[in-house]
Amino acid sequence: MTTSRHGPLRVGIGGPVGSGKTALMEGLCKALRARYDLCAITNDIYTKEDARLLTVAGALPEERIMGVETGGCPHTAIREDASINLAAVAEMRRRFPALDLILIESGGDNLAATFSPELADLTLYVIDVAGGEKIPRKGGPGITRSDLLVINKTDLAPLVGADLAVMEADTRRMRGSRPYVFTSLRQGEGVEEVARFVVEAGGL
């Protein structure tokens, strides 16, 4: 049961379409559900597909997964007008008063997407090696200012000609001392490291 007077830790997970946000949500749910009382909120523009995928994967019981249809720019629903997501958080807290952790996945967006501090206490940003080794040096708030940068699909690097050493050097240059992790989430690689970061940085 959460002991924080501020309520459960809220972790925002952002990143472009197809980068691996839902895979990270699934991995974190499975890694943390035995130790913490948690739920998941997903954002899609016109469907609740990501929520359905999490349910089918058995990440959490169906009642602990809520899909939000943003009906427009997914960036707006996590930043400029986060009211629809704040309402979802409030509803989950009503259903499960003992929550320790709420994971909030944004809809796919560009590198400029960021979470409102009103919505997320901790932010994870997922990028995809298949997008090319140039992605880290393109910058953007998600890459430079997220609490943890997740560089996913490392297994695809040889197939797309991406040099992970170059990506790491660019990541260090763009992020300074902020942490990052390389993952291959579909293979289960790196999930525990991300989960450990959430627990430690989030004070769980």
From Swiss-Prot:
Q: Where in the cell is it found?
A: Cytoplasm
Q: Which UniProt key words apply to this protein?
A: Chaperone, Cytoplasm, GTP-binding, Nickel insertion, Nucleotide-binding
Chief place of localization: cytoplasm
Choose one Gene Ontology CC annotation of this protein and give it: cytoplasm
Binding-site residues for GTP, renumbered to this chain: G15, P16, V17, G18, S19, G20, K21, T22
GO-annotated molecular function: GTP binding; GTPase activity; nickel cation binding
Q: Which Pfam families match?
A: cobW
* Superkingdom of the organism of origin: Bacteria
Gene3D superfamilies associated with the record: P-loop containing nucleotide triphosphate hydrolases (3.40.50.300)
Q: Which InterPro entries match?
A: CobW/HypB/UreG_nucleotide-bd, P-loop_NTPase, UreG
GO BP annotation list:
urea catabolic process
UniProt lists the family membership as follows: Belongs to the SIMIBI class G3E GTPase family. UreG subfamily.
Role, per record: Facilitates the functional incorporation of the urease nickel metallocenter. This process requires GTP hydrolysis, probably effectuated by UreG.
Entry-linked HAMAP family:
UreG
**Assembly state and interactors?**
Homodimer. UreD, UreF and UreG form a complex that acts as a GTP-hydrolysis-dependent molecular chaperone, activating the urease apoprotein by helping to assemble the nickel containing metallocenter of UreC. The UreE protein probably delivers the nickel.
Give the protein's recorded name: Urease accessory protein UreG
